[in-house]
Amino acid sequence: IGEVLIDLTQTGKDARGIPQFAANPGGAPANLAVAASRLGAQTAFIGKVGADAFGRYLKEVLAENKVDVSGMAVDANHPTTMAVVSVDATGERDFSFYRSANADVMLCKEDISDEALKASKIVHFGSVSLTADPSRTATLDAAARAKKLGATITYDPNYRANLWKNKEDAIAQMKAPLPLVDILKVSDEELPLLTGTTDCESGTAQLAQNGIRLIFVTLGANGVFYRFGDKTGHVAGVPCKVGDTNGAGDTFFGAALSKLCKEELDTLTVDKLESILAFANKAASITTSRHGAIPAMPTLAEVEG
């Protein structure tokens, strides 16, 4: 559940020095749905796009990647969201969003049916949906309904500073869903925002007090730290030449969830979890070695090969 948008990514400059941009599909929950789908999971996307060329294109991209788009709504009065993405020499990204009254924010409770939630083993969302209403209320309501219906709730507090009024508001809203969450992914940059510490052991122990059963802290090239109940550990990253990091975290989480949806947390062993995380790290490294998010995401054969 969440945003799907156009990433306008600079591809270079023409002979006159005018920047050239490619319109790429993006949005963390949509990226994750595609990543998991390419790796063999059945996925569906619930969100809202404008009645415009970009909205039609995004729906087509998700459908082409075998993501069920029957829950995607179209808003005739608000345009599809865009972000301008610039990538520096190390592959790190900077986002500028065009999103004051755009379609993804207009997702409302009525757009998310109980039938869609009942059909889901895992229901995932991110914090971009929580920046404003009605999407904030719709997302939290859907997560609460899905939890009651027996789904596993997964969450990525995907912090984008320029989407929030201020850091304090961001932290408060990003923390709000934590008591609903079963599986959480945070980056090493988001951990101190939510906990006040950069220490993975103490930070995840603090987060686990919300009842979160499985927590991942992604560490970029250094892999992932995990907390599973009272057990903690680290799984090394897979070295690669960086193209750009766009979609790497979404690929990691999508890959992990594509495997975890076949497991029960009650019976999951640490050995099995670590093999799932090694698989997810490899998938993320493949995405990182290429350019773009969705176009860069690997197939099952590529990760297992």
Regions found by a protein language model. Give the residues of each.
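Glycine-rich phosphate/adenosyl-contacting loop at the front of the ribokinase-like
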Residues: 1-68, 107
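Short beta-strand scaffold segments in enzyme catalytic cores
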Residues: 34, 82-86, 223-226
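Proline-centered loop/turn at the N-terminus of a beta-strand
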Residues: 42, 152, 183, 213-214
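Conserved N-terminal subdomain of the carbohydrate kinase-like
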Residues: 42-125, 304-305
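Conserved beta-alpha-beta core of the PfkB/ribokinase-like small-molecule kinase fold
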Residues: 128-205, 222-223
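Conserved phosphate-binding/catalytic region of the ribokinase-like
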Residues: 144-145, 196-305
